Each structure stands twice: as structure tokens, then as C-alpha cells.
Regions:
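Well-ordered mid-protein domain cores that form the structural environment of catalytic cofactors
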Residues: 1-53
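Residue-level recognition of beta-strand termini and adjacent short loop/turns
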Residues: 8, 99, 332-334
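Signature for the C-terminal beta-barrel architecture of outer-membrane proteins
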Residues: 10-12, 40-249, 254, 266-326
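Short, intrinsically disordered, charge-balanced linker/junction segments flanking boundaries
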Residues: 325-336
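N-terminal polybasic phosphate/anion-binding patch
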Residues: 258
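Long alpha-helical segments found as membrane-embedded helices
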Residues: 262-264
Length: 336
């Protein structure tokens, strides 16, 4: 939940702890609703054709190996979390109505260590300033923080009466154009893309959503897992992490108090070799943002979906299809 204060008709301050979802897609490559609730404070500015959000949040990263069950016996509970390392993140997005049903948005984010360069409980005040660019600020403060950038574009045709929506979203973790042109599969070309179509029937009873997403290996990761784009040992963005391709189709039928939903999700993802809980693999294919990119086995030859190129034992590509459905009935409110 959260607390909000309306400073003016166009400015709102908010703080609390809850999940966030940035974007119009079912999934988000920036911040996804499936992530753990995030302690945060935010500023929102809404004008006629522009909306700006600036968010500061505290992330937590858990280590396996618990404190003793009883302080005097020295035993640990396997599989529980003993160490909790904190980090900070800042994110902002500006969305603009471009006219004729078009909307565009720009996104920026940065994560930084709570303890860095000998400073404990470090809060970088520069990142809390609204309307700044995080990447130049990162260079200015002289710290190797983890920055992300992104953009989105959507179109809701006016003739469709808000029943049709085309939506796209990209995220850039790191990108060198010359390395893309070379075609050598450089590991640090880290990006993701998402596209979706939403359709609602004229009688508003049917709704269809088709969406596809792809994220290259090692996207969202960092040399230190505490600076990765994660919170409480899970991704802040798409729950699959990276090194995957996904397609989904959702259908909903609603009439009076009845609602029926059906969906299917297909995914192909490069997977690391299995390891015990809390044990980081010696080499990684870049699917889990919690694994440091330092443990990559190669710098080149990294495909969009990568199985390790035969350099990692028991690593491979996993493909699966999931179906789901539910039926709901809304009870009328009680009177009296």
C-alpha cells in the first residue's frame, strides 16, 4: 500500500511499499507487477499532454545460510536467508501524447550500492533530483553504477473508439552500434524488446491480447548481483529475467456478473546448469540477472537465445508451453 499527498492538481507525492508496473503491456521490460513489493517514494506530475514520474526505492538482496535456530547451538537452517544487503535505485519516465492516438515515453533508471568506495549507508542525492539524466550523473559522481534506458511507443486509432491498441517497449542496458554491425554476437549488447496488440469487441464483451517479448543474455545483470536490476532475489522487470523469447495470447469474455479468461504462454530460454540453493554457477549463460556477468564463458558468439555454446556442462535451451484459465462470478453487494 501507499500514502499519497496531492500538492496541487497536477503534482502528487507518494510513498509506501507495493509492486510497480511501468508500461501498457501485460509484461514490462522496465518494472513489472510480478516483482516483490518495493519500498519507495515518488513524484508524479500530470499535465494536459505529459506525465512524468520520478521514483526512489530501496532494494534488498538476500543471501542463503541462516542464523542459528537457537542462538546457543550454532546450527543453521538450510535454505533460509541470513544476509541482507541493501542497495538503492532511482527510475523515471516521461510520457507524452503525440496526437492522433500516438503516445511516446522515455525511461531511465540506475541502481547503486549502499556501501561503496569506503562509504557506508551511501545515498546518492543527485539521483533524487527530478528531470535529470542518470547516465551523465553517473559519470559525474564517479561511480560505476548500473544504468538502464528505454523507450515505448503506442497507437490507439481514434476510429477504433479505444478498442484497439498497438504497443511497443524497448530496454537498453548496454549497446555499441559498431558491435551490432559486426555481427559477432558481443556479450555486452544487452537489450530487450516487447510488442503487443490489444483488441476489444464493439459490445465490450470480448477482449484479446497478443504479446511477444525477447531479452538478450546478461541484460539487467551487473558485476555485483546487488547492483543488478533485481529485488529480494527476483527480477524487477520481466519475471523470466533475460536470455529468452516469449509469446502469449490472452482471451477474456465478460457478460453481466460472469467473467471467463483463457490464456497460453510459449517460452524458449537458455538455462544454466542446475546448482543447489544459494550456490552461484561457475559459468553462466546470462539468464538470471542475479548471476554476475563476470562468470560468462565467452565475449563473442552470444546469440539472442544462448545455450553456452558447449562451454558449460548441463546448460541448454528449455522450451515450454503453459495454458491457464479461470471463471469468476461477481456477487451483488449486500444491502442494509
Amino acid at each position: 500500500g501507499h500514502l499519497a499527498y496531492q500538492v496541487s492538481p497536477s503534482v502528487q507525492l507518494k510513498c509506501g511499499q507495493e509492486p510497480h508496473h511501468w508500461g501498457q503491456g501485460w509484461r514490462s521490460l522496465w518494472m513489472d507487477r510480478q516483482a516483490s513489493p518495493l519500498p519507495f517514494a515518488s513524484l508524479q506530475v500530470r499535465l494536459k499532454r505529459l506525465e512524468y514520474t520520478h521514483l526512489i526505492a530501496r532494494t534488498q538482496h538476500l543471501g542463503v545460510g541462516s542464523p542459528p535456530a537457537i542462538p546457543t547451538n550454532g546450527r543453521n537452517h538450510p535454505g533460509s536467508y541470513a544476509t541482507r544487503r541493501g542497495a538503492w535505485m532511482a527510475a523515471h519516465a516521461v510520457e507524452v501524447e503525440l496526437g492522433r492516438g500516438w503516445k511516446g515515453a522515455l525511461f531511465g533508471a540506475v541502481t547503486w550500492l549502499n556501501n561503496d568506495s569506503g562509504y557506508t549507508h551511501r545515498f546518492e542525492a543527485a539521483y533524487a533530483l527530478p528531470f535529470i539524466s542518470f547516465r551523465p550523473t553517473e559519470y559525474a559522481v564517479g561511480s560505476a553504477d548500473n544504468a538502464l534506458m528505454g523507450a515505448s511507443l503506442s497507437w490507439a486509432p481514434r476510429w477504433a473508439d479505444e478498442r484497439l491498441l498497438f504497443y511497443s517497449q524497448i530496454v537498453l542496458d548496454e549497446l555499441v552500434v559498431s558491435e551490432i554491425r559486426s555481427g559477432d554476437g558481443w556479450w555486452a549488447n544487452k537489450w530487450g524488446a516487447l510488442g503487443a496488440i490489444q483488441w476489444i469487441s464493439p459490445n465490450r464483451m470480448w477482449r484479446l491480447v497478443a504479446e511477444g517479448a525477447a531479452v538478450r543474455p546478461f541484460t539487467y545483470s551487473h558485476a555485483s548481483n546487488v547492483q543488478s536490476w533485481t529485488h529480494r532475489n527476483g527480477p524487477l522487470a520481466h519475471p523470466a529475467g533475460s536470455n529468452f523469447i516469449e509469446g502469449r495470447l490472452h482471451m477474456q469474455w465478460k457478460r453481466n456478473d460472469w467473467k471467463v479468461r483463457l490464456g497460453c504462454v510459449w517460452m524458449q530460454q537458455g538455462m544454466d546448469e542446475p546448482t543447489p540453493l544459494g550456490v552461484t554457477p561457475n559459468l553462466t549463460v546470462g539468464a538470471d540477472p542475479l548471476n554476475s556477468y563476470i562468470t560468462r564463458p565467452a565475449d563473442y558468439g552470444i546469440d539472442l537465445i544462448w545455450d553456452g555454446g558447449g562451454l558449460i556442462d548441463q546448460a541448454g535451451i528449455q522450451e515450454n508451453m503453459r495454458w491457464w484459465g479461470d471463471i469468476a462470478f461477481s456477487l451483488p453487494p449486500l444491502e442494509g
